[in-house]
């Protein structure tokens, strides 16, 4: 297990602390991985597309442009992430099916939950920088999250204690 406060203390000049509080919705309270990004407004087609690819050691960062009326992921899309070995999903937006998500072996952080699903028009962009919580989340940089908060690191995987696990 790792601790974001310990990582922040050890790597002060290498990590950027996110200043936006997130809620945990998956069963994994801590996760980390190399970032892949998707930006989409009221359409999660690209989210589903990228989570259908190999995600071993990766975290998907979803920029929903902070829409509050629709959820970027639910239980079906989260299952796709699990099936493709994603470490976690970080949603700058909302999720749904929270009672099912909490039982799933996946790290999921989001701002909150809502009941409505998005449109399905295959709109969105992959690989764009996401600016959220005072931090630039870039494709192929790293994200570390636990109950304490979340940190981003530019392009360098941190050395974790020997008892750390994804």
Task: Please report, for each region that a protein language model flagged, where it lies by residue.
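Feature captures the catalytic cores and cofactor-binding loops of soluble hydro-lyases/lyases
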Residues: 1-138
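Short, Lys/Arg- and Gly-enriched loop/turn segments at beta-strand edges
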Residues: 69-70, 150-155
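A very general structural signal that marks isolated residues within well-ordered alpha-helical segments
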Residues: 87, 162-163
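A short, compositionally biased micro-patch
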Residues: 94, 145-146
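C-terminal binding/interaction regions
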Residues: 142-143, 149-150
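Conserved small/polar residues in nucleotide/adenosyl-binding loops
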Residues: 156-162
């Amino acid at each position: 297990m790792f601790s974001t406060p310990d990582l922040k203390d050890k790597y002060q000049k290498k990590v950027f602390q996110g200043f936006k509080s997130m809620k945990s919705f998956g069963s994994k309270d801590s996760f980390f991985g190399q970032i892949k990004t998707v930006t989409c407004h009221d359409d999660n087609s690209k989210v589903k597309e990228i989570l259908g690819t190999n995600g071993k050691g990766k975290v998907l960062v979803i920029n929903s442009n902070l829409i509050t009326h629709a959820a970027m992921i639910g239980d079906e899309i989260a299952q796709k992430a699990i099936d493709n070995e994603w470490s976690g999903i970080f949603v700058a937006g909302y999720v749904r099916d929270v009672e099912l998500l909490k039982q799933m072996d996946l790290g999921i952080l989001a701002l909150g939950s809502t009941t409505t699903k998005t449109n399905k028009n295959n709109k969105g962009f992959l690989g764009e920088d996401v600016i959220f919580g005072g931090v630039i989340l870039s494709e192929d940089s790293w994200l570390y999250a636990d109950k304490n908060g979340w940190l981003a690191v530019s392009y360098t995987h941190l050395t974790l204690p020997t008892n750390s696990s994804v």
